[in-house]
Amino acid sequence: MRLIITRPEEDALPLKTKLESRGHSAILAPLLKIVPRLEASVPPLAYQFICTTSANALKFLQVESRLKAIPLLAVGPQSLLTAQENGFKFAEAHGGDVQGLAAHAAAKFVPQKGPVLYLSGAETSADLQALLMAAGFAVERIITYDAVIQRPDDIESAVKGADGVLLYSPRSARLWCDLIASSGLERRAAAPIYYCLSENVAKALPATWQKRVAKTPDEAAMLALLD
C-alpha cells in the first residue's frame, strides 16, 4: 500500500523503515515539527516517581543521575524504550493511554510520600496532570519541547493515489482536516483509509471517511491494522 505518515520527521523515519520492510510505500507528510526547550530543567525535589506520555519529552532533557534512580512510568513501549536508553533504571510502561497510566500510578503510589515529576510537551491529548492531582498527588510538570505546526510539501501529490493515512493524535487529525480543506482536496482525501491510534483520533475526522482504529494505542497495534 501507499501510506502517508503524518508524524514529526524524527518519529516518521523509523516508522517509514518498518513500513517499507513490510512491502509498503511510505510518504512523509509531517504536520508537526518538534522544537526542544533547551532551557528546561528539573527542580531538585524529592520526587517519588516520574511520569511521561511522550518519548520526545525524554529525548531533549539533560537527565541528571539523581533522576535515573527514581521509578518512571511511561505510557507505552516507545516512551519506555527512550527512558531505558536514557539510563532510567526502574522504568516500566503501563496503561497505553493517559487514563490507564494515571490509574496505575494511583494504585501503586501514595500521594503523601512525595511529589510527582511529569515530563511532557507543551500540548498533550489528555491532561495527566489533572488526573494525578485529582488522585491527591502534587505534580511538578516540566515541558521539554513544543510541537509546532508545519505544512508538508506538495500535499496534493501525496494524497493522490494514497491508499492510507496514519494518524497518531487528535491534534494531528484536526491539522490534517484543516490542511485538506485549505488545499481544496476534500474529495480526493475521502478516498484513503485512515488508520487511527485511538477512537479519539478517529472522532476528529469527518464521519464519511473510512477509518480503522488500533485495538490498543501503540505502534504495534497500528501496524497490525495493515496486515
Q: Where do the protein language model's features map onto the residues?
A:
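Signature of uroporphyrinogen-III synthase
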Residues: M1-D227
